[in-house]
Design a protein with these regions (language model features):
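N-terminal secretory signal peptides that target proteins for export/translocation
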Residues: 1-15
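Selective for proline/serine-rich intrinsically disordered segments
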Residues: 7, 29-30, 72, 292
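Hydrophobic residues within membrane-embedded alpha helices
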Residues: 8-11, 25, 68
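Polar/charged alpha-helical tracts
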Residues: 14-17, 142
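Bacterial N-terminal signal peptides
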Residues: 18-31
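Subset of outer-membrane beta-barrel
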Residues: 37-350
Length: 350
């Protein structure tokens, strides 16, 4: 639901300038704080939520206008007019990896009160039939009882393989409040639980904070700082991992044509990382990296949608159908190195 406040384009420029200053400040302040972060820790938290946003190249931080806002930008929960359930299932890389997402979001607060929103979300990533080859025998050329590569040769006996599974879970508890008409602030608390086979497990805790501005003439802008506390993941082996903060800013512009039968939305997200992943990013300045996520969405009578975008360097596209209160969305995600994947999600608005 868009605010009825009549903001001018000048107000939008002011907000955009402020968001830009936040990016620059974070670029100088955050890197020293995350120097001890573990690269790729908590990677499953980055898979995404909802085929609608994914079909737009994940350009959703500046839009965040449905129940998946709890994942993309929790500040958007304050703009929800009605409760909503969202669910998504995906299988990636030849069905090796399975991913599930489920959320319930609802507005709170009565007439005359500041709009607020609550949500609970569950994310799961699982990999089955992982071969554990640690029990295999080998020819010990050095006689030291240790497998030395490449001198020693492994004796592969598939009958001795032990198959395990890995499961990663995350529970998000999210809250948002409208500070004044058109501007909302929100946050999420995250609880992470991971298992690898029967012997390895970990627990983790973290938090996200986001802001969303909704103006007139179809403009909106938002920002989210994920893992603001540097999410800690503690393994039962005594090993500790940490997920470094990432800053993501976004803006969106919607325009309606012909009695609002046709609505086109253009969106752009920019993700700023501080973990020095230069090889996997599109641009970098020192240890600060940048990814760009442009996206488009077209609605016909708010019943049929077509989408396209770029998820960093990977092409994305999708479609959606709304029938009364029920919706189904599909997303196609290309990958420059691995197989493409398909996402299907469903939503119900009460």
């Amino acid at each position: 639901m868009k605010s009825t406040r009549r903001d001018s384009p000048r107000a939008f420029k002011a907000v955009a300038a402020r968001l830009g200053s936040v990016v620059l400040a974070a670029a100088f302040v955050l890197p020293p704080a995350v120097a001890g972060a573990t690269r790729y820790a908590g990677e499953f938290l980055r898979v995404g939520a909802g085929a609608r946003a994914l079909g737009m190249g994940s350009a959703f931080v500046g839009l965040a206008d449905d129940g998946t806002a709890a994942y993309w930008n929790p500040a958007g929960l304050a703009t929800l007019p009605d409760p909503q359930i969202n669910a998504m299932h995906a299988e990636q890389f030849g069905s090796i990896v399975q991913y599930d997402y489920l959320s319930y979001a609802m507005p709170v607060g009565g007439t005359g009160k500041a709009r607020q929103g609550l949500a609970v979300s569950l994310l799961r990533l699982g990999v089955s039939d992982i071969p554990d080859t640690r029990g295999l025998e080998f020819l010990d050329q050095n006689g030291n009882g240790v497998f030395d590569y490449p001198e020693d040769r492994l004796l592969v006996d598939e009958s001795k393989f032990v198959f395990d599974s890995a499961n990663d879970f995350a529970l998000l508890l999210s809250y948002s409040r409208e500070l004044h008409p058109g501007l909302a602030l929100g946050g999420s608390l995250k609880v992470v639980r991971q298992w690898l086979g029967d012997s390895l497990s970990s627990n983790g805790f973290g938090a996200d904070i986001g802001a969303l501005w909704v103006g007139s003439h179809g403009w909106s802008a938002g920002a989210i700082l994920r893992d603001i506390t540097t999410t800690q993941i503690l393994w039962n082996t005594g090993t500790n991992e940490s997920v470094s903060p990432t800053l993501r800013i976004g803006t969106a512009k919607s325009h309606a044509f012909k009695n609002r039968r046709h609505v086109v939305t253009a969106a752009l997200d920019i993700q700023v990382g501080f973990n020095g992943e230069e090889l996997s990013s599109q641009a970098s300045v020192g240890s600060v990296t940048f990814e760009f996520h442009p996206g488009l969405e077209y609605w016909l009578d708010r019943k049929l949608a077509l989408r396209a975008g770029m998820d960093a360097a990977n092409f994305a596209a999708g479609a959606g159908v709304r029938i009364h209160r029920f919706g189904v969305d599909y997303a196609y995600l290309d990958h420059r190195d691995l197989d493409s994947s398909h996402r299907i999600s469903a939503s119900y608005t009460f």
